[in-house]
Amino acid sequence: EKICFEYLKNCNFEKKLENFYKKKTILITGGAGAIGSNLAISLSKLVGKRGKIIVLDNLSAIRDEEPWNLPSLENMIFVKGDIRNDEDLKRVFKERPEIIFHLAAFFANQNSVDYPENSASVDVMGQIKLLEYAALTNVERFVYASSGCAIYGSYPKLPLVEDFISMHLTTPYQINKMTGEMYCNFYNHHYGLKTVNCRFFNSYGPGEVSGQYRNVIPNFLFWSR
């Protein structure tokens, strides 16, 4: 860990990040959630006053009693909408996003077991529609929020190897997330759209809430009170 931080410090990583994102227009789907809102706040600082952050979220996973994670910022636009809806996508793509962070999802495993059709509708068909818009408008980069449990399965062999792919998938969420990675690869090879697949493992942090369909660590913290 110490070596890693020293490397980042010596190579001016923060400055390179700032130079890369400066003045960019960035679309974040699912940007009102815990990960998305923290990402939006961080990127809003990097893009600067001449850049723009567009947050697209249908707020389906937010309960009335939960705090609103997104601040009101001069360079941030919030659009309440659905990635499956053409009118909503046309609205955000009018802003000409250069980079997309696709975090919107029908979250997560148990929810997908209870409602498999809704899960496939959002996590597969919604993503295909978003990828299509990204390819047609020459988006520079499409970053997809995948899942470690989806790719490595419920019972992976240890130690894990990064290029290992499991067929032991036990929930529609796992199946859909793996499918999402494959569609990213397809749009990369077929259309030249630059895509990045990020595999999250039980993420937690500011803005996370507990609940039946939420991540395990926030639930542990809630139950321990």
List the model feature ranges, each with a label.
Residues 1-203:
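N-terminal Rossmann-like NAD(P)+-binding domain of SDR-like oxidoreductases, especially those catalyzing
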Residues 93, 168, 209-213, 225:
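Residue-level signature of the cytosolic catalytic core of signaling kinases
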Residues 178, 203-218:
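Glycine/proline-rich active-site loop of Rossmann-fold NAD(P)-dependent oxidoreductases
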Residues 189, 203, 218-225:
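Alpha-helical substrate-binding/gating segment
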